[in-house]
């Protein structure tokens, strides 16, 4: 037995050594080193960015790049250890601005702390493009690559046209460039390291960045993802145009050591990360990634959101999003693909990657479509429909929908191809507008003139009597502001966990108003000649007004128009998730005496199907859990309530009445009331505070320094419904608040 154990241990060690040797062995196949990682193990972020980057490369270079080559190169970059997350800069080059901003520390020396590179992943991708471009000797591609952005991202390098031309000249005449015929992993890493070094030494750099890269005439022992390599930048920069290939190879101190003599490299981050993600549950094809039916538990084993966190931004990174005055917008489906014309570079935009989490399944309200049926009316700011797109887009195991930017002429579409849930398409009408939402429900939107229209805050619903009054959301003192039969009636059948809300950080600016549109089309299609239209009148005054207009959506027949027809796709089955992830946040809290600037908007919802049934699953809803904070300002609020069953995970949308004042169906849907609103007694509030258990959710007016009115929301859950009541603190010198 002892002999067998020793033999087994020896064989195991031998296998490990041989595997390590294979990582850095020299071969005639230049891509062998990049063919060791399986794309099936990627997370949704990796899969998304892979196709984004591949499209970007083909847009710039118009070359047929090997899918395996691109896969393995990007896999290598994605797999490096992430030390920290931060937004390096605000360079706007779509779609690269949607990349996760991560810092990677590349150790250049194990003895000196300053022998290292701290580079953002944003820069590493540009570096890879530069490497691929110059290696393939494609001059147009090299000229088009944004080296200036690369330098800015990496070292705060201020590249001029002269310095850039000199760097490219040195780069093309260097020994390393001419020695790329044996495209080994060591040579590749030396090559990319040389790009960093060359850009750093041929331009004016900020002194504080010297720690990132230091010139050294001595060979540097470099730890790479493929093992260890030796870089001698002094010999690399020695240009010898008349040298022979043998002398060129000799000048590079990454020697061609036989694989049998190569020491065992240290375990690389690549091996570690992909061991954690090892699974066969995700099946991906090169052009149309899909996901097989699997359980939520298995998905969580594949992708952990903490493994690939979304970027975090500071308030200064997010510009304002305001509303255009007197804007008449007609929202239609846009079939334009921004990557159809590879010759035109991507249009820059300030939108960062946006994530909205939705429940797994939607079971929407069905409304017959005829000329007399009234549908939900949308008070404009954001328009929601439901859209199914089956295109070269990416699936999302975590039920995340990434709302990517759309310029005024093109739309970047992202969808969960395997889900039957609604699909979102993000549209902006101003390049300067940007919205960011992260997976941890933190978002920041700043607006001017107290305009606040939340993505889930502006739905006006046709009145509907409740079917079961006992299941309605109980709002304290509801009848006092149920003027003109505008009461809050929301049905719920799910008990939610009491998670803490995250407040929205508001910041004002002086940008002119603009319009943002969030559109989704329904799964069921209307005939192409049937259009649901909504014409609304909305003011930007945050205070409730008695003359606020309420619009009604009409379904009319129109001549057939060329609009997008969503295609069908497969389904994915999930088990019950532990909690319903919120969609959007309705959060209003501001005082304003700004004059009302009316604007109108026409929303067209056009679908096509054999059945004349419109399945309207509206994502402008208010779940009972904290929503992802997105804040704009308006006088109308959410009135559609999303509910879900704890067992079947079916989400139902029920209509509710809404007042033009305040819709207290969500703890953070709080708007300061004008003086003509009936005052809620302090005694009643104190009684409600004593009788209702739950968590405190506070929303503070950060702009009111002299009158800090703090509204405290009490929430508690029962078996069938979640009840909310409100408690407030009044300042006698301030306006009454609800």
Curated annotation (Swiss-Prot):
**InterPro entries, sorted:** Roseolovirus_U47
**Which UniProt key words apply to this protein?**
Glycoprotein, Host cell membrane, Host membrane, Membrane, Signal, Virion
Pfam name, any one: Herpes_U47
Coiled-coil residue windows:
none
Q: Where is this region: Disordered?
A: 240-272, 330-351, 541-568, 667-712
User: Glycosylated residues?
Assistant: 41, 64, 114, 175, 190, 201, 221, 273, 326, 353, 370, 445, 477, 483, 529, 547, 573, 629, 646, 689, 710, 720, 733
Q: Which residues form the signal peptide?
A: 1-23
Q: Where is the composition biased (Low complexity)?
A: 240-263
> Can you summarize the PTM annotation of this record?
120 kDa Glycoprotein O: A shorter mature protein, gO-80K, is produced probably by proteolytic cleavage. 120 kDa Glycoprotein O: Modified with high mannose-oligosaccharides.
Bias type Polar residues, positions: 330-342, 541-554
Origin superkingdom: Viruses
> Which ranges are annotated Basic and acidic residues under compositional bias?
673-689, 698-708
Q: Which cysteines are joined by disulfide bonds?
A: none
Q: What's any one GO cellular component for it?
A: virion component
Similarity-based family:
Belongs to the herpesviridae U47 family.
Q: Write the protein's name.
A: 130 kDa Glycoprotein O
> To which species is this protein native?
Human herpesvirus 6B (strain Z29) (HHV-6 variant B)
Q: Which gene name belongs to this protein?
A: U47
């Amino acid at each position: 037995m002892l002999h067998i154990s020793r033999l087994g241990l020896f064989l195991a060690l031998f296998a490990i050594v041989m595997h390590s040797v294979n990582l850095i062995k020299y071969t005639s196949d230049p891509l062998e080193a990049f063919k060791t990682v399986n794309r099936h193990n990627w997370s949704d972020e990796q899969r998304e960015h892979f196709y984004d980057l591949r499209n970007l490369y083909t847009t710039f270079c118009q070359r047929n790049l090997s899918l395996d080559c691109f896969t393995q190169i990007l896999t290598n970059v994605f797999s490096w250890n992430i030390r920290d997350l931060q937004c390096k800069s605000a360079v706007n080059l779509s779609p690269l601005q949607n990349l996760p901003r991560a810092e990677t520390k590349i150790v250049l020396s194990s003895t000196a702390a300053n022998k290292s590179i701290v580079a953002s992943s944003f820069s590493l991708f540009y570096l890879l493009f530069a490497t691929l471009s110059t290696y393939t000797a494609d001059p147009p591609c090299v000229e088009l690559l944004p080296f200036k952005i690369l330098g800015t991202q990496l070292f705060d390098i201020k590249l001029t046209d002269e310095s850039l031309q000199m760097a490219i000249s040195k780069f093309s005449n260097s020994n390393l460039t001419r020695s790329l015929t044996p495209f080994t992993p060591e040579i590749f890493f030396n090559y990319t390291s040389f790009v960093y070094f060359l850009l750093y030494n041929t331009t004016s750099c900020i002194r504080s960045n010297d720690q990132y890269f230091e010139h050294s005439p001595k060979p540097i022992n470099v730890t790479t993802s493929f093992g260890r390599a030796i870089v001698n930048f002094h010999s690399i920069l020695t240009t010898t145009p008349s040298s022979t290939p043998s002398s060129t190879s000799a000048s590079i101190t990454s020697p061609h050591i036989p694989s049998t003599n190569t020491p065992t490299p240290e375990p690389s981050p690549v091996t570690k990360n992909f061991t954690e993600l090892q699974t066969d549950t995700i099946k991906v094809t090169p052009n149309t990634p899909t996901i097989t039916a699997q359980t939520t538990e298995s998905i969580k084993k594949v992708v952990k959101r903490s493994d690939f966190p979304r970027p975090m931004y500071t308030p200064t990174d997010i510009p304002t999003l305001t509303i255009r005055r007197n804007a008449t917008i007609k929202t239609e489906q846009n079939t334009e693909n921004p990557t159809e014309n590879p010759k035109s570079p991507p249009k820059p935009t300030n939108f960062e990657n946006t994530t909205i989490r939705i429940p797994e399944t939607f079971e929407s309200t069905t409304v017959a479509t005829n000329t007399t049926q009234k549908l939900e009316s949308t008070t404009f700011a954001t328009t929601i429909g439901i859209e199914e797109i089956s295109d070269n887009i990416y699936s999302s195991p975590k039920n995340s929908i990434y709302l990517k930017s759309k310029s005024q002429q093109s739309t970047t579409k992202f969808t969960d191809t395997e889900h039957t849930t609604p699909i979102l398409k993000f549209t902006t009408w101003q390049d300067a507008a940007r919205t960011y939402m992260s997976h941890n429900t933190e978002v920041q939107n700043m607006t001017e003139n107290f305009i606040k229209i939340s993505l889930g805050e502006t739905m006006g619903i046709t009145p509907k009597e409740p079917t079961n009054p006992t299941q309605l959301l109980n709002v304290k003192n509801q009848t006092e502001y149920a003027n003109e039969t505008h009461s809050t009636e929301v049905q719920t059948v799910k008990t939610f966990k009491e998670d803490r809300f995250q407040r929205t950080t508001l910041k004002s600016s002086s940008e002119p108003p603009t319009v943002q549109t969030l559109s989704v089309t329904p799964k069921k299609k209307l005939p192409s000649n049937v259009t649901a239209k909504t014409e609304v009148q909305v003011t930007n005054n945050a205070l409730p007004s008695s003359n606020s207009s309420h619009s009604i959506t009409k379904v009319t027949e129109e001549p057939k128009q060329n609009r997008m027809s969503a295609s069908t796709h497969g389904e994915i089955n999930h088990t019950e998730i532990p909690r319903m992830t919120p969609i959007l946040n309705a959060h209003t809290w501001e005082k304003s005496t700004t004059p009302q600037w009316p604007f109108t908007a026409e929303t067209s919802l056009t679908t096509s199907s054999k059945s004349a049934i419109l399945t309207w699953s509206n994502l402008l809803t208010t779940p009972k859990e904290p929503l992802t904070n997105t804040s704009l300002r308006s006088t109308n609020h959410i009135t559609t309530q999303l509910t879900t069953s704890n067992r079947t995970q079916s989400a139902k949308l029920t209509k509710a009445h809404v007042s033009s004042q305040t819709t207290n169906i969500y703890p953070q849907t709080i708007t300061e009331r004008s003086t003509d609103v009936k005052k809620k007694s302090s005694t009643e509030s104190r009684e409600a505070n004593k009788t209702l258990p739950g968590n405190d959710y506070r929303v503070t007016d950060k702009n009111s320094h002299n009158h800090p009115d703090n509204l405290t929301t009490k929430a508690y859950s029962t078996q069938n419904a979640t009840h909310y009541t409100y408690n407030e603190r009044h300042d006698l010198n301030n306006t009454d608040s609800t």
